[in-house]
Swiss-Prot record:
It comes from Aliivibrio fischeri (strain ATCC 700601 / ES114) (Vibrio fischeri). GO terms for molecular function: ATP binding; phosphoribosylamine-glycine ligase activity; phosphoribosylformylglycinamidine cyclo-ligase activity. Keywords: ATP-binding, Cytoplasm, Ligase, Nucleotide-binding, Purine biosynthesis. It holds the Pfam family AIRS. One of its GO terms (biological process) is adenine biosynthetic process. It catalyses: 2-formamido-N(1)-(5-O-phospho-beta-D-ribosyl)acetamidine + ATP = 5-amino-1-(5-phospho-beta-D-ribosyl)imidazole + ADP + phosphate + H(+). It is found in: Cytoplasm. It is an enzyme of class 6 (ligase). This is Phosphoribosylformylglycinamidine cyclo-ligase. The lineage of its organism: Bacteria, Pseudomonadati, Pseudomonadota, Gammaproteobacteria, Vibrionales.
Length: 346
């Protein structure tokens, strides 16, 4: 190497290995708190090891991946990063419960232009809290510092979850039949969907995020973390004959409920069976959003829709409410003609 040339380092290129190591040290306690007995070893290896729980006779693995969309931009604008990790876990594990799966382990991907250890630690601490709520282990992840790919300290996150279900107990919608009852399980707010529309509404209405609505600021309503349904849903599944579960995410009622319905059936939803949480009425008014578009974009207060035999509905609602959920009968399954829409909201 020539003496008159500057010696370049990875840090000169914008990647701080020491910061990455500091983050790993900060989150070791978070990972430890999520540990399950099936997990072998700790973080830092090239791969993570996890045994299958011994209680399963014919275990099927169920996997899922998701992000939190442009809710991240809201978190960045508010400089509030401690709950976005809960959102990330929720979006993944709530998809697994649709098939009756118990989440086993979770991995995260955190990418940024310049690693802020404090912000990243807040995000991962939220991921750990989400894993605790879901009963799954945080067994690894990737932190990618990529200068030139992201603006400043902006970041993006993705989650990956694997769960397990007994083969004979998979919930796949094939048992859904006309006459089944539909149960709604309430959401905590918009969860992690529709935020591009939310941000557009905020822009065109020039809304004040510090405005109060039912005792909370608009900002607090919008950043409220996604509800994790795992523990209450698993208990419901254990005690009732669940025919289908739909996680109401992007696409709202119109897109998500048909995903779990067999041909020849439709969900008839009683729109008068619940009142939308105030934040949805506020969004509709501020954005002059059509009701059809609201149901197509947002969960409108419903996080899960569950199909089960009508005679079991009231008991299932009571169980869910005893577990701390807000559940109610929202409608029923009816026969559908060929080509008919599979969701009807009356």
């Amino acid at each position: 190497m020539s003496d008159n040339k500057t010696s370049l380092s990875y840090k000169d290129a914008g990647v701080d290995i020491d910061a990455g190591n500091a983050l790993v040290d900060r989150i070791k306690g978070v990972v430890k708190r999520t540990r399950r007995p099936e997990v072998m070893g700790g973080i830092g290896g090239f791969g993570a090891l996890c045994e299958l729980p011994t209680k399963y006779k014919q275990p099927l693995l169920v996997s899922g991946t998701d992000g939190v969309g442009t809710k991240l931009r809201l978190a960045l604008d508010l400089n509030k990063h401690d709950t976005i990790g809960i959102d990330l876990v929720a979006m993944c594990v709530n998809d697994l419960i649709v098939q009756g799966a118990e989440p086993l382990f979770f991995l995260d991907y955190y990418a940024t232009g310049k690693l802020d250890v404090d912000v990243a630690a807040e995000v991962v601490t939220g991921i750990g809290e989400g894993c605790i709520q879901a009963g799954c282990a945080l067994i690894g992840g990737e932190t990618a510092e990529m200068p030139g790919m992201y603006e400043g300290e902006d970041y993006d996150v993705a989650g990956f979850c694997v769960g397990v279900v007994e083969k004979e107990d998979v919930i796949d919608g094939t048992k859904v039949a006309a006459g089944d009852a539909l149960i709604a399980v309430g959401s905590s707010g918009p969860h992690s969907n529709g935020y591009s529309l939310i941000r557009k509404i905020l822009e065109v209405s020039n809304a004040d995020l510090n405005e109060e609505l039912n005792g909370k600021t608009i900002a607090a309503h919008l950043i409220e973390p996604t509800k994790i349904y795992i523990k209450s849903a698993l208990k419901m599944i254990a005690e009732h004959d669940i025919h289908a579960i739909s996680h109401i995410t992007g696409g709202g009622f119109w897109e998500n409920i048909p995903r779990v319905l067999p041909q020849g059936t439709k969900a008839v939803v009683d729109g008068s069976s619940w009142e939308w949480p105030a934040i949805f009425n506020w969004l509709q008014e501020k954005g002059n959003v059509d009701t059809y578009e609201m149901y197509r974009t947002f969960n409108c207060g419903v996080g899960l829709v569950v199909a089960l035999p009508k005679e079991q509905a009231e008991q299932a609602v009571a169980l869910l409410n005893a577990e701390g959920e807000n559940a109610w009968v929202i409608g029923e399954i009816a026969a559908a003609e060929q080509g008919e829409e599979q969701v009807e909201i009356r």
